[in-house]
Curated annotation (Swiss-Prot):
Cofactor(s) listed in the protein's UniProt record: Zn(2+)
Region span, Disordered: 1-26
Source organism per UniProt: Halobacterium salinarum (strain ATCC 700922 / JCM 11081 / NRC-1) (Halobacterium halobium)
SUPFAM superfamilies cross-referenced by the UniProt entry: Zn-binding ribosomal proteins
Protein name from the UniProt record: Large ribosomal subunit protein eL37
First and last residues of each zinc finger (C4-type): 20-38
InterPro entries: Ribosomal_eL37, Ribosomal_eL37/eL43, Ribosomal_eL37_CS, Ribosomal_zn-bd
Domain of life, per lineage: Archaea
Similarity section: Belongs to the eukaryotic ribosomal protein eL37 family.
Keyword terms of this UniProt record: Metal-binding, Ribonucleoprotein, Ribosomal protein, RNA-binding, rRNA-binding, Zinc, Zinc-finger
GO terms (BP aspect): translation
Gene Ontology MF annotations: rRNA binding; structural constituent of ribosome; zinc ion binding
Gene: rpl37e
Length: 58
């Protein structure tokens, strides 16, 4: 019977995110091949959302 306790945490030693070639952030998912910051790998367009700006900025 294995759980999600302290012994299981020692297995979490794989690198998930590496440096992105396009934006330079440490957000490029090596298994998914997609950057969570700029969207590199998923589309040619930059990842950008309306909710990213400050509230009240028009």
């Amino acid at each position: 019977m294995t759980g999600a306790g302290t012994p299981s945490q020692g297995k979490k030693n794989t690198t998930t995110h590496t440096k992105c070639r396009r934006c330079g952030e440490k957000s490029y998912h090596t298994k998914k091949k997609v950057c969570s910051s700029c969207g590199f790998g998923a589309s040619a367009k930059r990842r950008d959302y309306e909710w990213q700006g400050k509230t009240g900025d028009n």
